[in-house]
A protein has these predicted regions:
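Active-site neighborhoods and metal-handling regions in enzymes and metal-associated proteins
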Residues: 1-572
């Protein structure tokens, strides 16, 4: 997409602005770069972003994870707003003009458009959804380089037919249209690899109430190669699916407005009623079965082994990476040695010193910071294994200087994790209580962070699942066997950034609920100020490290064992 095409469009249509989202057709959090309009236009990558494009300027909106990175990237070329402080709606209303604008109807959800439009209309601001493009655009990933697999029976929690029947039994209409790729993958025990760092098929799913074949909505011919799919489903492209619904005389179906794009909704609304479903598939995914938990714990052994070897190699200078990007490549190569490793679960965040204060920093291959004279490394990484998905953040001391500020903050971040792991919470609490609990503790020591405290994690699926979200505004209810991250941090712009992240499973215990840590990577004791650590906390850290050593010992070479015992157990 070229800026002159947008300017010409605004002039020809006599409108004031064009709103650019960062979505793909299925509204995925992390679309492929070649499907992201913001990236194609500006070469800036983020998982959440919007651009208001005017003829004489553009305004960039993102969340706190990317504001610092955006300021460094765009410099003074545009205005940048943190969405938690100024929304797109806020900005447009502040202009005090009767503005009109447009957006691509295929790249915004029904829910988001309705919220946007209802508030803007009250202020006499009109936004027109566009159903035809004014420039050439590719909406689909490259299916030719993809492959698709049906999950092995020994790993799946339920047969796909049982999943479909559960949905059918809760339908209030003639059928449900599921547009979220992660939901399709999970319900059908299906994985596909056309989306980078993901395992989701780029497909929708229609489940009819009556006993006729469900429909997979996809352009991916690889799906036909899966026998259960070719036998049990019709596979239609989007246009053919819409025609099918019309010919079949469906009158009332349901969907999630949060996940369906506006274009599909408008096309279907011409001949049927499309209501908001009450079926919460995200919540369905968020509660793991005992089999899933066991599988996920298995993949964390593989992942812990890879990350541990990487950390020891880095500390012992057994590897000599040139820069931040090469550091992440070394870790990736360690993970590739793991049993049933498939791919990364997201682009690694590998950041030295002041770059670590950029919350979602992505190291460029050539221009990232060199390894010379650095003091700390923050590395946030994860992987997709056949048994599950991982996500972990550790901070590693790589220099010789002793920064009291860093040790102080790191120690209290570690103490906050120990505190939350030992707390007996009530059952069925809102996830926001965990967020409040850890923030209240850290605020006593003047440690704050602007991002959420955690997110759900998939089972060989999305690294960021929609349920549960651990944040101050979340209404999600925690039950037994939820899987999510807890990742408090502390960031000082221009100096350093710290974050510690583990994955936890909720477990009913003694009439309440506790968090079980399933991450198997030790903390860097060189960053711990033991003067601030209680005797209980010291023993807790030691037991955690001993547990890791016991699980990984048989697969460690002697030099790794010696380092672990000397520096990660006996030092405590």
């Amino acid at each position: 997409m070229k800026t002159h095409l947008i300017k010409n469009f605004l002039k020809n249509k006599k409108i004031d602005f064009y709103l650019i989202t960062n979505n793909d057709l299925h509204l995925n959090e992390s679309p492929n770069l070649d499907l992201k309009d913001i990236y194609k236009l500006f070469k800036f990558d983020c998982t959440r972003g919007y651009v208001l494009f005017f003829i004489d300027k553009f305004i960039f909106f993102t969340d706190s994870r990317y504001t610092l990175a955006a300021k460094k990237f765009f410099k003074s070329n545009c205005e940048i707003y943190d969405l938690s402080e100024t929304t797109i709606i806020d900005y447009l209303i502040m202009q005090n003009n009767k503005l009109s604008g447009a957006l691509d109807s295929k790249l915004i959800s029904v829910k988001e458009f309705r919220e946007l439009n209802s508030k803007l209309e009250k202020n006499k601001i009109v936004i027109h959804p566009q159903f035809k493009n004014f420039f050439k655009k590719e909406y689909y990933p490259n299916f030719n380089i993809s492959y698709t697999l049906s999950m092995p029976k020994y790993l799946i929690p339920r047969q796909f037919k049982d999943n479909l029947n559960k949905i059918k039994n809760n339908l209030k209409t003639e059928g449900i249209l599921i547009w979220n790729n992660a939901h399709v993958a999970y319900l059908l025990n299906l994985r596909s690899f056309e989306l980078w760092n993901s395992t989701k098929p780029f497909a929708g799913l229609f489940i009819p109430k009556k006993n006729i074949k469900p429909v997979l909505i996809s352009n991916n011919s690889n799906l036909n190669k899966i026998s259960k799919i070719s036998k049990s489903f019709n596979i239609f492209r989007e246009e053919k699916f819409i025609h099918y619904l019309k010919l079949s005389k469906f009158k009332n179906i349901e969907t999630s407005y949060e996940f369906l794009n506006l274009n599909v909704y408008m096309c279907l609304s011409k001949f049927l009623n499309l209501s908001e479903t009450r079926i919460n598939i995200s919540k369905y995914l968020g509660v793991k079965t005992s089999k899933e938990i066991k599988n996920i714990e298995t993949c964390h052994i593989e992942d812990g082994l890879a990350v541990l070897k990487f950390i020891i190699d880095l500390k012992q200078k057994n590897i000599d990476p040139k820069n931040e990007y090469h550091v992440s490549e070394h870790l990736f190569n360690k993970r590739k040695e793991g049993i049933n490793f498939f791919r990364n679960s997201f682009d690694y965040i590998s950041a030295f010193d002041s770059n670590a204060a950029i919350i979602h920093y992505k190291p460029p291959p050539k221009k990232s910071l060199s390894c010379n004279n650095r003091q700390i490394l923050l590395i946030d990484s994860g992987a997709q294994y056949l048994e599950g998905t991982t996500d972990i953040t550790r901070v590693i001391k790589v220099g010789n200087k002793n920064f009291s500020k860093i040790k102080y903050s790191y120690t209290y971040l570690l103490k906050s994790l120990i505190k939350i792991e030992n707390k007996l919470f009530s059952r069925n609490i809102k996830s926001s209580i965990l967020d409040l609990y850890i923030r209240n503790y850290l605020s006593k020591f003047k440690i704050y962070y602007s991002h959420g405290t955690g997110h759900g994690v998939g089972n060989f699926g999305d690294v960021h699942e929609k349920y549960p979200i651990i944040s101050s505004k979340s209404q999600d209810i925690l039950t037994n066997n939820n899987l999510f991250s807890i990742e408090p941090g502390h960031y000082v712009e221009g100096q350093f950034g710290l974050r510690l992240e583990n994955l936890y499973v909720t477990k009913n215990s003694n009439g309440g609920m506790k968090l079980k840590n399933i991450t198997l990577v030790p903390y860097d004791l060189d960053l711990v100020d033991f003067r601030l650590i209680t005797n209980f906390e010291r023993k807790f850290i030691k037991r955690y490290h001993q547990k890791i050593y016991k699980l990984l010992e048989s697969r460690l070479r002697d030099e790794y064992k010696r380092y672990f015992l000397k520096n990660l157990i006996n030092k405590i």
